[in-house]
Curated annotation (Swiss-Prot):
This is Cytochrome B pre-mRNA-processing protein 6. The modification Phosphothreonine is found at T97. The modification N-acetylserine is found at S2. Pfam families: UQCC2_CBP6. GO terms for biological process: mitochondrial respiratory chain complex III assembly; mRNA processing; positive regulation of mitochondrial translation; protein stabilization. Its main location: mitochondrion. One of its GO terms (cellular component) is mitochondrial matrix. This protein is involved in processing of the 5' terminus and the intervening sequences of cytochrome b pre-mRNA. It is found in: Mitochondrion. Disulfide bonds: none annotated. Present with 2130 molecules/cell in log phase SD medium. InterPro entries: Cbp6.
Amino acid sequence: MSSSQVVRDSAKKLVNLLEKYPKDRIHHLVSFRDVQIARFRRVAGLPNVDDKGKSIKEKKPSLDEIKSIINRTSGPLGLNKEMLTKIQNKMVDEKFTEESINEQIRALSTIMNNKFRNYYDIGDKLYKPAGNPQYYQRLINAVDGKKKESLFTAMRTVLFGK
């Protein structure tokens, strides 16, 4: 098996593991999970798909658009040669090896299995402090949108801290 095929197979394993990774609870413009899936799908030779499973085709410029760009610019896209070499030197060319992808697979699997959370367990003293045992649970409920405080309970929390 050639090294590029081994890298593709490892990237496929990583994509499968990333797809099992839970989506963010709070929707962001860019998600770690989505960016990494798209990145390693290219390495694995898999087509990019959206949330519904439809394949996303990369939009390539048409021949007329390319001709228009060339006709409008005096140099290569209006940039001088020095600037192009600077840009090319700054561009990151990702070279993946089987070992580097396997390291990422191991790191992601330890995160997903809560290995370090279980190893360094801190107990209930920190999660439920004696002064305000429901504090963290209320925060989590507020973030998840499960339980909303009424005006009265919010004022009580502000005034008395509990």
